[in-house]
Amino acid sequence: MPIKTFRPYTPSRRTITVADFSEITTKTPEKRLVKGLRKTGGRNNTGMIMVRHIGGGHKRAYRQIDFKREKYGVPAKVATIEYDPNRNARICLLHYADGDKRYIIHPVGLKIGDEVMSGPNAEIKVGNCLPLKNIPEGTFIHALELKVGKGAQLVRSAGSQAQLMAKENDYAHVKMPSGEIRLVPIACCASIGQVGNVEHNNIVIGNAGRKRHRGVKPTVRGSAMNAVDHPMGGGRGHSKGGNIPRSPWNQPSRGLKTRPKKSWDWMIVSDRRKNKAGK
């Protein structure tokens, strides 16, 4: 995916980069697979802010993605490659031989007209979905399940890929994009290949307007707030407050360990932090 740059006729245009949507084949999504999406503004059902810095943004329609890939043994052809405003990866529309249509995440190398299939007897090629026990060790995968039949939960963002390292009894060792090696039930399914739109992490937003268009609001420093709004707020001028940096909820924001000491995740073989064992 090429990235477009612009002549610096304004200060922000100097740094802005935009994705080249040359791989997109249609602008109109499949109507049957689209539903409305209500904005929350980061609030829960009682109106309290659960996630800060969310609000506004362009209206979106939600594309229903098939993360379960449960149509075993039914071949499908790639009909379109489309833009999805709800994720940073592209999606592609599959036309199944029985007439069904479904969206999946678009992996690198999958083209219009290619045939894909899911199931234990599927071929090891890009876009196919198989249980981990049927995938050779060393294969790069994406759209990985954590629980059998629940649907893909891991490795779904643009450019990401995991690697199947080993198989042992009822579990497979999978190396995640973060470097963490964890156990996954060997009956869980995963898709072959790397998620597309690999150059997404090189895109520079460049100005505030693009950020607001995406529904992201500004992040205000705590020291710039009033004392009633933040533990580090208040004072005259640029006041340091004489205390350690704290979060808006008065927790020390640097170095405080929040994970319970008795917690143990035995499914983490090697932690992403300096390759520690899971604790």
From Swiss-Prot:
Which keywords does this Swiss-Prot/TrEMBL entry list? Ribonucleoprotein, Ribosomal protein, RNA-binding, rRNA-binding
Q: Which GO terms describe its biological process?
A: cytoplasmic translation
Q: Which GO terms describe its molecular function?
A: rRNA binding; structural constituent of ribosome; transferase activity
Q: Where is this region: Disordered?
A: 224-279
Q: In the UniProt record, does the keyword Ribosomal protein occur?
A: yes
Q: Which InterPro entries match?
A: NA-bd_OB-fold (IPR012340), Rib_uL2_dom2 (IPR014722), Ribosomal_uL2 (IPR002171), Ribosomal_uL2_bac/org-type (IPR005880), Ribosomal_uL2_C (IPR022669), Ribosomal_uL2_CS (IPR022671), Ribosomal_uL2_dom3 (IPR014726), Ribosomal_uL2_RNA-bd_dom (IPR022666)
Q: Which PROSITE patterns match?
A: RIBOSOMAL_L2
Lineage: superkingdom: Bacteria
Q: Which GO terms describe its cellular component?
A: large ribosomal subunit
Subunit-structure text: Part of the 50S ribosomal subunit. Forms a bridge to the 30S subunit in the 70S ribosome.
Q: What does this protein do?
A: One of the primary rRNA binding proteins. Required for association of the 30S and 50S subunits to form the 70S ribosome, for tRNA binding and peptide bond formation. It has been suggested to have peptidyltransferase activity; this is somewhat controversial. Makes several contacts with the 16S rRNA in the 70S ribosome.
| Assigned protein family | Belongs to the universal ribosomal protein uL2 family.
Protein name as annotated: Large ribosomal subunit protein uL2
